[in-house]
Amino acid sequence: MKFKSTPENITLVQNAFQTIQNTTGGISLGRKSLPDSITLIKESVLTSMTKLGNSYPFAVYQDKSNIYHLVYEKGPYLLRKGGDKKTILSVHNLLSKLPLGLFNIAEENGNEELVLEWINKYPDWSPLHVSAAVGLEKYILKESQRSDWEVISCQVDSHDGKTPLHIASEEGNDKIVSLLLQKGCDLSKLDIKGENSIHLASRKGNVECISKMFEFGDLSKNINIENENGETPLHLAISNGQVDVVEYLLLFKESDIHYLKIKGFSKGSILEYGRRIENKNTSIYKCLTLLCQSYPELINEVIDKDKNNILHLSTDKLFLQALLSESHTCTYIDVNATNRFGLTPIHKAILNDNLSILITLYGYGCSINNSDPSGDTPLHYAVRSGNIQIVKALLCFNANIKAINNNGESIMCVLQKSNHSNKDIIKKCLDLFESQGNIQDHTDELERFEQSNSMAYQLKKDIENKKHSVNVLSLDGGGVKGMVIIQILLYIEKRLGSDLMKHFDWISGTSTGGIIAIGLAEEMPLLSIQKLYLRFKDKVFIGERPYNSEVLKKIFIDNFGNKTMAEIKSDKKVFVTTVQGNVCPSELCLFRNYMLPGFSDEINKNRGFFQLNKVPIWKALRCSTAAPTYFEAVDNKYIDGGVMANNPTINTIADIQLYNTALNAKNQKPHEISCILSIGTGKNPKKTVESLNVNLPTGITDVITTARSIINLKNIFLEQLTSADGEPVNRARSWAHTMKSPFFRFSPTFTEDIELDCKDDNVIVNMLWETEKYLRKDGACDVLMLTGFLENFKR
């Protein structure tokens, strides 16, 4: 009869083990405080002591200080020593019962010392336990011929109740596991904690042992057994971060013969179990990701009496990302599920004042406008709680500021009824979004004249000429600050009241701008790109620089597949920049989805036009984003395009001119640039540089000053090398106006430095908020002019 892991049976086993221990006379065998490792002992030391009795090879010696030494005389090895004669003799008596054949085989295999280590730690183990721990296959084969094999193979140790199969599984001796199972050992046997051998192998990550259990044992009937804490082998593998074991166990999900249980555990949801694991590491998060990837429906599982699911209860951002990172795209996951009170996970995050959870949930598709049964939206909750950062985040993510609850209360009305200290600040935030503000033109008279003339020229063109005109969108580099570009595009689109991208024909991007450019060319909605970035930053910027380039590559493949530049979905022309850095001087390269029309492959190649079907989108993006010190160069050759063209506007104009030359050469009508929209990733605040002089130092003060000057000059050099604002913008604007093309540039100035790899949610929210303020104030006039031009430039 199989032993079931019920509380009553576990108590029975525990009582039985206590009886076994009592037979030793209540003597401690050293389990609570294990002895030191065995050591060689000199013969001269032994001869200086008195041997008690004539036993061999285990013997007890007494020194002049009345300290007793347990010795294995073949070494000789000192196993343990102490002043308690009774304990030492008790251990000696146990070891003396071990058969010499065990040691002879251990000597043959060179494992004699290892055997001694084990028996010194666990003197109550049987020879089979020791053999299972060490891997003495020959001894086990010999013992299996005995008539009482069925009895001795099931013997348990007096402390943990483990059989030899338990020990072999725990120690990762897969050959022994295989042998014991083939010789009839029972996989269903439980130790004192109610754990079978699968539990032990899972905890230690011994996936090969579990594989042998599947091959030679009854894995299907024992894979879901719960221990005294309600944990199955899958639970233990997850809590110990054993990724390989979790991957293996998940192979048995819902198959015809084997079924891995994932619900209905005595202690509740396995995801809730995962949430409560303390000090979670990367491996544990990976295990949880694998689980949800295989069983995404677990995310919908109701966990408690309030009908919360795991998304409602999550307060750890990394845990939440682990659950959603590979499963959020599943159509049957309800990320907006409501609990008993009608609250979504976003509502709960706001009640917990947890900005990071809110942003993570939004990034993985949770709605920020769903209301509770009272009609309160997340923004109602946020203004009521008084969390400024959460209010700003919701507004930046386009929360409905005009929402009215069932009591007829607007967002502003709920705020006015609140009594928290942030009331006035939040009112200013709401006012910024509710009013159009006082739109002022911040350009000078000369620039207004050039821009007005250019707009007038383009708007007066006839339909035929307009059809041959192209509107250009150019996107700067800047790492995570690419979210600024997305925020600006979303705002312009909202003001325009229609799909912004239908107005643009030629898109270019550098680094982060390249990602957005490709996303737009692939017809990804702006909100989808925004959410991609919110997920992206926490996946990529992990640990120290340089970051793992393979993670970046995987993100690109997950979103764009293995399509080449030639297979880009829309008919828009697009390119991303990169730099060939393995030559000096370095060379700017463009990965395009177009070639020079009417010219041979050779001429195209000479002009730097790559064969489109040989450049995967993911590789073009990896090259463009390979920022030095942040990510590895691609093919030890290509680095971030921002090194030479962080603002690719001029390069875009030049490329269109080259394309037009090809058209002219083939007697085709060239394209005229009708509008240029250049979007930056924001400017860090200006800083005063105190010293620039580099002289030979004459004293310690001069050394410090010179060192500062060198650092300042280095910073100036790097800033100018990768500059996207200032002169690059002035040159692009001048060139555009020379062609009678209106030029629009948007790039806010921040109040604090923002690093390319920033992933701090508070900093990100402030960055987006300052972008929104800029668009509604300093940039408001340009937004109005741009949207007016696009609406009236009919083609």
Predicted feature locations:
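Ankyrin-repeat inter-repeat connecting loop/turn
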Residues: E150-C154, L187, K221-I223, D256-L260, ...
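Short, tandemly repeated low-complexity microdomains enriched for cysteine and small residues
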Residues: D191, N222-N227, L249, H258-G264, ...
